[in-house]
């Protein structure tokens, strides 16, 4: 078993130590006796209330897949560790400006964003279509810009500029100023990584049609 799987299993056990009824009230979660349900980047997940295991489905759980590390760790962190009175500020900030940490992988000029920008370069139509498939709301500025739901209670903005003769492709992510009330700084990396993965999946589907 990989270190990632070990950590995920540890967190599933950790999840069971928390008050699930409080989670339900806090985030208005759909639930039944066996599961809690939550949407994460327009995909429905369920958390087993006895084992803590997280799975997702696109067919109302007739079939299901295990959540990967980024997905599971983000959901666990939000449900278990968000501040009691977390709330959106309704004010966008650059993800690299999160106040508690300077630099790191979420800095605007990090390899993380440069590499993602390269993948989108020359594919603005596909990127826009992917954002629309994820029910994004079109925004101003940038060659492509959309507000997307990370969670129903926590949107983000994806903004992209294509490369030209003077500048490389540029990807910018804006988050709510209070995002760290919902998750740890390190978890933001997992969440945005999953967001970009979902956008990439929808781009691939569009190009294959």
Which role fits each region the language model picked out?
Residues 23-51, 137-162:
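Amphipathic, interaction-prone secondary-structure segments
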Residues 1-34, 78-134:
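Short Lys/Arg-enriched alpha/beta "domain-start" segment
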Residues 44-73, 161-186:
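Intrinsically disordered, low-complexity regulatory segments enriched in Ser/Thr/Pro
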